[in-house]
Swiss-Prot record:
A Pfam match: PrmA
Subcellular location: Cytoplasm
Cited PANTHER family: ELECTRON TRANSFER FLAVOPROTEIN BETA SUBUNIT LYSINE METHYLTRANSFERASE
Native organism: Carboxydothermus hydrogenoformans (strain ATCC BAA-161 / DSM 6008 / Z-2901)
Lineage, uppermost ranks: Bacteria, Bacillati, Bacillota, Clostridia, Thermoanaerobacterales
Catalytic activity: L-lysyl-[protein] + 3 S-adenosyl-L-methionine = N(6),N(6),N(6)-trimethyl-L-lysyl-[protein] + 3 S-adenosyl-L-homocysteine + 3 H(+)
This protein's name: Ribosomal protein L11 methyltransferase
Superkingdom of origin organism: Bacteria
CDD domains xref list: AdoMet_MTases
Gene Ontology molecular function terms on file: protein-lysine N-methyltransferase activity
Gene: prmA
Length: 305
């Protein structure tokens, strides 16, 4: 199916206004590329790591894109949107082009192939199981466009470490579960019960779908939750593949929710922040029992003594 992509360049302060106009015309989706907002986040060091093309970071104005089914009324639609934008009395540039649905809705799938990580094989639902891999613990996943494929080095570090710390009978919490991969992996290792927590309702929906695909609903409970706030069970293992700042915020709560001898696995930590995260874990009472670095990222495993 063909779509019309309409792109409007405006000053950053008008991006939400333009997006609202697109929604008025029943767009199928809106994206905003705002260099000013990106630089605010970068300069505030909210992200430990980021990767954006120079064309976005160095742009003088923001770009708001919207997608509409290509129909015979497209010229009327373009004219109406143009007039609506003019009525705002703000400077803007409008561009448009035809695109295939494949190019923006499904093209990412061609790059997501089965990947081995330690004892596991992560397989997208639309791919066949590679021959000779039947002995692997298979994680089937359909992350959708809202989430990564789970094969990032931070996830791989956790998957490689999990078999040492998750075993039959363990109770596990996966904080910031995202697509649910680490919760699923814990279930495949024999954990008795897993709680998959995420503050993002979209993540909760995606995680539940992936858990259903893997037929693990009886073992994994997905909860929309802010970190461990209000979670009052004592558990054996807590996993947090998030970022350094959040792991530091989580440290004391994780320590208190773990049984004696319990394990905390933290990933998503850039190597430059490894020491401060270690210091925080030690401060609240943990003992560091494993450290591993890969590709500029760090995994820390700590035990409650």
């Amino acid at each position: 199916m063909k779509y019309l992509e309409i792109a409007v360049e405006v000053e950053s302060c008008f991006t939400e206004t333009v997006a609202d106009i697109f929604w008025e015309f029943n767009t199928g989706g809106v994206s905003i590329e705002d260099p000013l907002l990106l630089w605010q986040y970068i300069n505030a060091q909210i992200w430990d790591a980021y990767e954006f093309p120079d064309s976005v970071l160095k742009a003088e104005r923001a770009t708001v894109r919207a997608y509409f089914p290509l129909t015979e009324n497209i010229n009327t639609l373009l004219s109406q949107i143009n007039e609506r934008l003019k009525s705002l009395g703000i400077p803007f540039n409008l561009y448009f082009q035809e695109v295939d649905e494949e190019s923006w809705a499904n093209s990412w799938k061609k790059y997501f192939k089965p990947v081995e990580v330690g004892e596991f094989l992560i397989k997208p639902t639309w791919e066949k199981l590679p021959s000779g891999k039947e002995d692997k613990k298979i994680i089937e996943i359909d992350p959708g466009m809202a989430f990564g494929t789970g094969t990032h080095v931070t996830t791989a570090l956790v998957l490689e470490a999990l078999p040492k710390y998750v075993s039959p009978g363990k109770v596990v919490v996966d904080v910031g579960t995202g697509s649910g991969i680490l919760a699923i992996a814990s279930a495949l290792l024999g954990a008795e019960k897993i709680y998959a927590l995420d503050i993002d309702p979209v993540a909760v929906k995606v995680a539940r779908e992936n858990i259903s695909i893997n037929r693990l609903e009886d073992k994994i409970t997905v909860i929309e939750n802010d970190l461990l706030h209000g979670f009052n069970q004592t558990v054996d293992v807590i996993i947090a593949n998030i970022i350094a700042a959040v792991i530091k915020e989580l440290a004391l709560d994780a320590y208190e929710k773990l049984a004696t001898g319990g394990i905390f696995i933290g990933s998503g930590i850039i190597v430059e922040r490894e020491k401060e995260v270690m210091d925080k874990l030690l401060e609240v009472g943990f003992k560091i029992i494993e450290r591993k670095n890969s590709g500029g990222w760090c995994l820390l495993v700590a035990r409650k003594e």
